[in-house]
Regions:
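Metallo-beta-lactamase
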Residues: 2-16, 26-30, 57, 64-65, 84, 88-173, ...
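Active-site metal-binding motif and surrounding structural segment of the metallo-beta-lactamase
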Residues: 15-58
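Alpha-helix initiation and capping sites
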Residues: 38-41, 79, 93
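Short gly/pro/ser/thr-enriched loop/turn and capping motifs at secondary-structure boundaries
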Residues: 41, 62-65
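Short secondary-structure transition/capping segments
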Residues: 46, 67-70, 162-163
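Short, hinge-like loop/turn segments at secondary-structure boundaries
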Residues: 50-54, 72-76, 168-169
Length: 173
């Protein structure tokens, strides 16, 4: 969750238990909920009922997404101030989203992961739709020099030197 003056933003939330719901409520609830790809829907429908948040999903998955979002995001969209959307082509789902917050924190769905502390890796090749497009998407993100933190949908977050970790990943590809 990102605490934001225009309402808190949830990105790919996990299912919430009663304690989580109470804690979220104590922080002001959630006004916005972004799903990076259809594999991260999880308990979103129930969370939306609980919070009343506006929901966004990847535009490229609009026709087959498991539920109707309030709006659909494409590359370059800015659904909330200080959030920029990147579409990560070639991943396991069409138009997977990566979310850049305050130009310093990157939240990714599945294409970029971290199964080892301090090191990023790419989704295994056999799960990619198109390796070349996936690599190009990652290299496009590594051009954002202001990234300090990288929070992958799968694995360990990197809280310092996120840009360096992205460059290291891109060089391995």
């Amino acid at each position: 969750m990102w605490v934001h003056p225009a309402g808190n933003v949830l990105i790919d939330p996990l299912p919430l238990n009663e304690h989580d719901e109470n804690h979220l409520d104590s922080l002001g609830g959630a006004a916005h909920l972004i799903i990076t790809n259809s594999d991260h829907v999880r308990d979103t429908a129930r969370i939306l009922l609980f919070t009343g948040a506006k929901s966004w999903g990847p535009h490229a998955e609009k026709e087959q997404f498991p539920f109707d979002c309030d709006d659909w995001l494409k590359d370059g969209d800015k659904p909330v101030s200080n959030i920029e959307v990147f579409c990560m082509e070639g991943s396991k789902t069409p138009g997977e989203l990566a979310i850049l917050i305050d130009e310093t924190t990157l939240v990714t769905g599945d294409i970029i992961r971290a199964h080892e502390g301090g090191r990023l890796c790419m989704l295994p090749v056999e799960k990619l739709q198109n390796r070349e497009l996936a690599v190009n998407s990652i290299k496009r993100i590594d051009a954002v020099k202001s990234i300090e933190a990288e929070i992958p949908g799968d694995g360990w977050p990197i809280f310092k030197n996120g840009h360096d970790a992205l460059i290291e990943l891109a060089e391995k590809l």
